[in-house]
């Protein structure tokens, strides 16, 4: 059980690198790919150097998945008028929170699943417009 906990911490570190990488590359069109590549390498290296090769694999896989997912959010936020600096600040903060939460057993693995699933869901709904107060203007 201890080894699974350590692998979960490495997975959480990969998720944190994915979120931070997405924030760093938010202004670029290829933000998801750049964030995934950086998080893959960083998550794998940290997991392997701090723990062992199994943790390195988990950190790399979760880093790539979260980089793709968070990069989709970051690119969409900047495209809709958010500032790249503000987006980066929010995503780096989210990465720190994700890393701290990964010390809870199994949460690091759940982060690796939740971030890409939420990004896929947001991407499917990307064309919809929220009516908001426009419904009252009729």
Positions of predicted regions on the chain:
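N-terminal signal-anchor/start-transfer transmembrane helix
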Residues: 3-27
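Alpha-helical transmembrane segments and their membrane-interface exit regions
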Residues: 18, 63-72, 114-126
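Hydrophobic alpha-helical transmembrane segments
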Residues: 21-27, 44-52, 96-103
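Cytoplasmic-side transmembrane-helix entry/capping segments in multi-pass membrane proteins
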Residues: 27-42, 57-65, 81-92
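Transmembrane alpha-helix boundary signature
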Residues: 47-57, 76-82
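Loop-to-transmembrane alpha-helix initiation sites
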Residues: 55-61, 103-115
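Membrane-helix boundary connector in multi-pass membrane proteins
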Residues: 79-111
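Short, highly charged, low-complexity non-transmembrane loops/tails of multi-pass membrane proteins
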Residues: 122-138
């Amino acid at each position: 059980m201890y080894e699974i906990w350590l692998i979960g911490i490495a997975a959480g570190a990969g998720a944190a690198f994915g979120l931070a990488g997405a924030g760093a590359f938010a202004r670029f069109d290829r933000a998801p790919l750049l964030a995934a590549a950086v998080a893959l390498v960083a998550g794998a290296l940290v997991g392997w150097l701090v723990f062992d090769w199994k943790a390195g694999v988990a950190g790399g896989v979760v880093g790539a998945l979260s980089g793709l997912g968070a990069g989709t959010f970051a690119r969409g936020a900047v495209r809709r008028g958010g500032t790249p600096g503000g987006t980066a600040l929010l995503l780096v903060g989210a990465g720190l929170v994700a890393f701290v939460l990964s010390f809870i057993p199994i949460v690091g693995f759940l982060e690796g699943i939740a971030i890409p699933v939420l990004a896929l869901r947001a991407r499917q709904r990307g064309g919809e417009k929220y009516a908001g107060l426009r419904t009252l203007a009729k």
